[in-house]
Amino acid sequence: MREQLEQLRCEAFQAIADASTGEALQNIRIKYLGRKGAMTALMKGLGALSAEERPVVGQMVNSIRDEIESGIEAGLFAARERARDEKLRSERIDVTLPGRRPGCGSKHPITLVIEEVCDIFAGLGFSVAEGPEIEHDWYNFEALNFPPEHPARDMQDTFFVDNNLLLRTHTSPVQIRTMLKRKPPLRIIAPGTVYRCDSDATHSPMFHQIEGLMVDQGVSFGDLKGILTIFTNQLFGQKTGVRLRPSFFPFTEPSAEVDIACVICGGKGCRVCKNSGWLEILGAGMVDPEVYRHVGYDAEAVSGFAFGMGIERIAMLKYGISDMRLLFENDVRFLRQF
């Protein structure tokens, strides 16, 4: 029986050595150590041994059982280690590879236009000035030659906060505030947000303007046209035609509407320009002497011009945008184009 036990031991350890998976090792445990296994079958023969041999063989059976159990446990541990190593190899991450970069946004078309306009005028000697969006009636209207009952106030529907405070309807109040703080000569542009009760495909209740002001000795209407011609040529192209049409603004005299040759048809006439060949882009004029009086300037000693443009309109013309509301809907499919 001792020979049978030793042979069983050798067979079991050979099977353990050949097993490569945990499942195979569990089958070996069942085959040799299970209730119907080989060791159990041999132990049934202990009763046939003499009283002297029985304890010796019994001790040998227990020793071999423990050895096989230890061998199986060692094999299971090794199998788990191999499985773990294989998983690590298959899921290995190369830490030297670059990571996934988050999607980068881009500047809004309104921001792009404001920056470009400011850069152009900076090259012409203009500095940027700012003012509050909640403005006093005096700065927004009266100082700009809009007296309380002036009919020109009907040109703009205004959001009033109370009797004297309002959401500014243009950035022209920045010109008043700047002239009250500084003496000529001065050249400023004032980009900012303005508010009016108007909303359709070409108007928004909140939009952006850039006002410009130049005051010095001997400034003429010709200087105004020259500055605006340089500006439009740099913004829309060197061959962009410019024309000025008589108009009216309470704070400038004389006043003009500034048109450029249609950027779509090149001045030949199309649906965008209503077959006129021209597109209106801004209003301008020589500063009215009454405005100088409000800020304490001597209208006999200095002269100057002012102009104002809607940034949304400039963006629509520059980028071929048909509906102003697209600029405020935050549609990523639209904004990704810029």
Curated annotation (Swiss-Prot):
One of its GO terms (molecular function) is phenylalanine-tRNA ligase activity. It is an enzyme of class 6 (ligase). NCBIfam families: pheS (TIGR00468). One of its GO terms (biological process) is phenylalanyl-tRNA aminoacylation. Mg(2+) binds at E253. Keywords: Aminoacyl-tRNA synthetase, ATP-binding, Cytoplasm, Ligase, Magnesium, Metal-binding, Nucleotide-binding, Protein biosynthesis. This is Phenylalanine--tRNA ligase alpha subunit. Pfam families: Phe_tRNA-synt_N (PF02912), tRNA-synt_2d (PF01409). Tetramer of two alpha and two beta subunits.
